[in-house]
């Protein structure tokens, strides 16, 4: 359920500004200096997955995303790719699944691959499951494989993980 609620947001600060009662009715469009940088607030998602700590600090250091840190932003990028069912992201998600040292990111990549589907994703999930040392990440991989299996008989292809 958490994955569904995040949707395609990388961080929630923009949403808070939109719904804040203090900001209701304010028109910030005439203050160019307050306009968000599109590259910062809506970055390309796949490059975020390979971003180093230094690159993250350089790119997001002056934004509200910086206080969240790289890991949550990368996790949320993986979730967004899963929600978009972005097939072109499968190779990058497989790299996260196979190579990332963080079990949370490996498990989240498994979830995204389960949402996107395809033979390449399924092969990678099966291979990853055989060598996954973390029990929670392994459970996410199993759930993703189950979602892929149920997608053949389900119209939506979606099983909440």
What does each of the following model-derived ranges do?
Residues 55-60, 86-98, 118-130, 151-161:
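Amphipathic alpha-helical scaffolding segments comprising HEAT/armadillo-like alpha-solenoid repeats
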Residues 67, 71-72, 87, 101-104, ...:
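Alpha-helix N-cap/helix-start positions at coil->helix boundaries
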């Amino acid at each position: 359920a958490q994955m569904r609620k995040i949707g395609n947001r990388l961080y929630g600060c923009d949403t808070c500004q939109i719904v804040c009662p203090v900001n209701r009715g304010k028109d910030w469009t005439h203050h160019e200096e307050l306009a968000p940088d599109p590259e910062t607030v809506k970055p390309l998602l796949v490059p975020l997955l390979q971003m180093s700590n230094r690159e993250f600090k350089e790119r997001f250091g002056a934004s509200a995303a910086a206080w969240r840190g790289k890991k949550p932003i990368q996790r949320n990028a993986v979730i967004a790719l899963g929600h978009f069912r972005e097939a072109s992201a499968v190779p990058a998600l497989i790299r996260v699944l196979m190579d990332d040292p963080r079990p949370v990111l490996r498990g989240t990549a498994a979830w995204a691959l389960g949402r996107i589907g395809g033979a390449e994703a399924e092969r990678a999930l099966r291979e990853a499951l055989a060598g996954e040392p973390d029990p929670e990440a392994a459970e996410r991989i199993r759930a993703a494989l189950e979602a892929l299996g149920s997608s053949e008989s389900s119209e939506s292809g979606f099983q909440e993980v």
